[in-house]
Swiss-Prot record:
Organism placement in taxonomy: Eukaryota, Metazoa, Chordata, Craniata, Vertebrata
Source organism (scientific name): Homo sapiens (Human)
Protein name as catalogued: Cell division cycle-associated protein 2
Start-end of Polar residues biased regions: 979-992, 1000-1010
Biased composition (Low complexity): 679-691
Residues passing through the membrane, by range: none
Positions of post-translational Phosphoserine modification: 98, 120, 126, 131, 210, 291, 309, 400, 407, 437, 591, 614, 710, 756, 936, 977, 1000
Amino acid sequence: MDANSKDKPPETKESAMNNAGNASFILGTGKIVTPQKHAELPPNPCTPDTFKSPLNFSTVTVEQLGITPESFVRNSAGKSSSYLKKCRRRSAVGARGSPETNHLIRFIARQQNIKNARKSPLAQDSPSQGSPALYRNVNTLRERISAFQSAFHSIKENEKMTGCLEFSEAGKESEMTDLTRKEGLSACQQSGFPAVLSSKRRRISYQRDSDENLTDAEGKVIGLQIFNIDTDRACAVETSVDLSEISSKLGSTQSGFLVEESLPLSELTETSNALKVADCVVGKGSSDAVSPDTFTAEVSSDAVPDVRSPATPACRRDLPTPKTFVLRSVLKKPSVKMCLESLQEHCNNLYDDDGTHPSLISNLPNCCKEKEAEDEENFEAPAFLNMRKRKRVTFGEDLSPEVFDESLPANTPLRKGGTPVCKKDFSGLSSLLLEQSPVPEPLPQPDFDDKGENLENIEPLQVSFAVLSSPNKSSISETLSGTDTFSSSNNHEKISSPKVGRITRTSNRRNQLVSVVEESVCNLLNTEVQPCKEKKINRRKSQETKCTKRALPKKSQVLKSCRKKKGKGKKSVQKSLYGERDIASKKPLLSPIPELPEVPEMTPSIPSIRRLGSGYFSSNGKLEEVKTPKNPVKRKDLLRHDPDLHMHQGYDKYDVSEFCSYIKSSSSLGNATSDEDPNTNIMNINENKNIPKAKNKSESENEPKAGTDSPVSCASVTEERVASDSPKPALTLQQGQEFSAGGQNAENLCQFFKISPDLNIKCERKDDFLGAAEGKLQCNRLMPNSQKDCHCLGDVLIENTKESKSQSEDLGRKPMESSSVVSCRDRKDRRRSMCYSDGRSLHLEKNGNHTPSSSVGSSVEISLENSELFKDLSDAIEQTFQRRNSETKVRRSTRLQKDLENEGLVWISLPLPSTSQKAKRRTICTFDSSGFESMSPIKETVSSRQKPQMAPPVSDPENSQGPAAGSSDEPGKRRKSFCISTLANTKATSQFKGYRRRSSLNGKGESSLTALERIEHNGERKQ
């Protein structure tokens, strides 16, 4: 047993080891399994394996069971499993991983490396492929890079060697091979590495390698090596190759090659040799792989290497070498010197390294001279064209490749329309531009100063501007400007003080620029630099002087300045337009409640009223004439009479209606349609309760009876007759008691109306007309609830309502004065407005505004009164119109007046220029309308009384008027009598009830109804 027990622990160890091996094997197979932790632990005697075999407890010892004195003693730190576990746990905390995890990570990394090496075709040929341990052990980027370098070194080196042999001279080949080896190692490592590394890593590695190689090769290749690194990296670049060969090879090479060539181009553009080299390289490069446009675009752009196509990422990164710095410096700071210095340094490096520099330099100028014209032509024009496309920014005219004036600091923005200094082509271009720019010379209107002085000032100004704008320009530009710049600056300062001379300066500057271009190339260059400055100067002057001439100075510049001037002019014009707009906007007020001008609205409201009334009465003029004088006097008297009548007979609305109808009938005795009229009047009265319907019915019925207008009047008069024939006459007499005594008053009224039969007829006509007009207006107004009229006729209706109120008050007074025609006339004037108010009152009766109904009754009485009353009524109408004109109508909300049916905004005349009585009546109308609404039960009782007495249709309109009268009793007896008179008048003139209803609408929107009624009366009176 002891032996077994002793053997078992080794078995456990072996099993643990085997398990670990299995784990690793499993990992090798692809399964990821962490090695068993107990593999490293010391064997535990008490493992389940020990208990696998049957134990004979009689013979089993404690050791076999794992119980030993050692088990009770702490094992050494290295031996105890618990301690090891704790250590592992502790080490694992915050640590990269436990031994198991580290082992797993390493194994996985190895497996991945092996797979990558197998997959990558380049790695297959690499010598390191035979030793996967290299890949397995590769833990750092450098190791990987070295592995790839070793793998691709031979291939890349061979390729580069062949390229070098093809393009380089014999003595240069060895140097080329060295350079290519250096570059090739990095390039091959990086080029082969891309399979594993990302493009960014490749670029970075290329940059590193290219930077290292460039330090050696920059001088030799003159920045061309970087291009060759991407393709046949060092070989084609090396100075041994002629520029023609180099350019052809570069053309064959990727665009990246041209990218770095663009750097030398930017550098060489300043020097003729450099320009020639760049042109040659660009020419061939464009013909081969990259177009000169892209090349020039690269030159123009600060991040030329970044701008290059993705095929040349290495070259892009290679650019950050001193060459790239040179290009950036060219863009940022003076640069011609920098480029020359950088080139010189490269040449010196070539001298030292290969001694091939002289040949390269000689080759460069030769090739450049040969291809100068072709390359410059092909390169420059498409170059700046493509530059425009690529940059998508055009500073005025097309920019030549010299747009970036190397003499100027890179951060100096190009002047719009201006081009940087160029020695050859740009001078011609600048001369052309200068010649073109002076085209607006005839425009220089401000010749306030002498031209000579202006010319003198202009040249220094231009130079000074150039100097000031570009203080960092090359010494050439400064020397060209020379002392002239200082003198020009002084002159400019002198001239700057007078703003008037500035305009002349611009024109003179143009002339001077042309002359300068003719004088010398240096002057042309200065002027070329100056055009932008001049543009700026012109802009400044234009801004300061704001003269139109400044827009003329130069084409592009002048156009821009003109645009600015035009814009300013437009702004000024816009201001005027805005002012007009303000005025226009003032016409339609922004407020949702437009305040209608009284006079203009009154006139349009008249035709609208006529239109409304025309349907009911054909003879508008006739009815208007009768109606105008008749209604005011009658209304006044009747208003007086009706209030008293209604007060005495208060609730006998039927009697009141009878009296009104009797009065109307008496007034309409001359009319033969009395029989027809009763029904019509009854219909009208009923319709007056239902204002729109009553109006339409009464008017429609009245029209067939005696012509559209006259039948209406006749109908209203006959209604009065019928009322008088029936117990209504008695009621009318009772109401007439206000004038005298019951029936006598009625007779007096009849007589009063008959005082002048013609006038009475006119009054009847007018009453009828007013009734028809009121019916119409009621129909049209009541249907929209006087909203239409409130808007257009609100002012007139308000005034009419005021007048109707005052007239109703007068009528309340005039029942006693009814005997006197003069008082009736005075009342007529008011009653005219009262007639309107009557129509409104009828409408208000519907709406709960009963005051207008009483005014209607007064209008009926007016119709019964003499022709003098008609005259007075016409006068009153005129006065009402005048009052309306003088009055300012304002819409006010009836929110506080809960009794008014018409809720919302109502037209009210604030000044109420009408008589105090009218003003009171108006206020009473509006105020009483609410009171009338509160009095509606009384009205209902009166209407109920009148209904049994009157025919139901007649009683209905009477009820509509009667409630108005009843309600008017509480707020004011005048109001009641007014409503009663309107009830009688509703019988007499259901059309007047329409008017009254309109006026009642005016109670809510009194102004609109009153305005409509007044307009109708005026139109009728005029007709």
